[in-house]
């Protein structure tokens, strides 16, 4: 996924990177005096393109990285489920906080995400599955978000290595089986629990909170003015999500620098390993990883030139804006099918 607001920088021979500015500006080809004073030589040091981390492309790539890691984590276990936890009217009362209605100026009550509810749920799940079901290794990836229409707080949780003895099929929605579990519902205890089988699609939907979460210098102010806590994610650590798959398949992954993912409608798609895998592999095989990086750079440069020269006659900044707008419109057109 391309960045729509890339930065330009220089990497010195000692590995230090200095960021110059936005690649969309036309003055990016020369290093300013501020960089020269830091010892950057624009003729001998390596010029690099750095993703901004904030645009639609970067956020979507970040969410896909997490979806990939969750998908690969799930491949290491026999039973994995996707849970949606919602609040009933009685239990949503403890989430209400005062806020000012911007249209009327009145003080109103709004429901805000409460991370501790999710943390307590996971603690109870792990304790019960260890004590009752002899399973001490339940792992998870979860997010807290607000509903798109009613802004009601809720949670999505992927549970890995999680056999549910009393799983009951209650519906079939858009081709997806929907289950419930009396045991899991009692452990949540604050509203409804719906359960689906986990897939790359459910992982992608869970990680999609990054597309909605505000970022940047105004983010804290926006949440403060709204009177609510931001969307968030929590996950198992030590080891991280996907680590087991990396350990079992790292030689195969980096021999071809790619991982094949099954498509929902059949076939497969090969993508680069998640950055988390890159970090692990770089620590173990620094020389091999350096070779891989050089190959990636050559491919990226060819793709970059084709993107700006072979596909458009628009000025760089206009083309980036158009690309991002098209991607935003595509995302808005998507409808939840789970």
Predicted regions: what they are:
Residues 85, 157-161, 319:
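Short beta-strand element of the conserved SAM-dependent methyltransferase core
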Residues 8, 14-16, 26, 44-45, ...:
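Intrinsic-disorder/low-complexity loop/linker signature
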Residues 1-71:
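DNA replication initiation on ssDNA origins
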Residues 53, 111, 305-307:
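Non-catalytic peripheral regions of nucleotide-handling enzymes
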Residues 107-108, 147-153, 159-297:
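Conserved His + Asp/Glu catalytic blocks
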Residues 191-194, 295-338:
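C-terminal non-catalytic accessory extensions
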Residues 61-149:
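Signature for HUH/AEP ssDNA processing cores
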Residues 53, 81, 153:
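Residue-level detector of short, conserved catalytic/binding motifs and their immediate flanks
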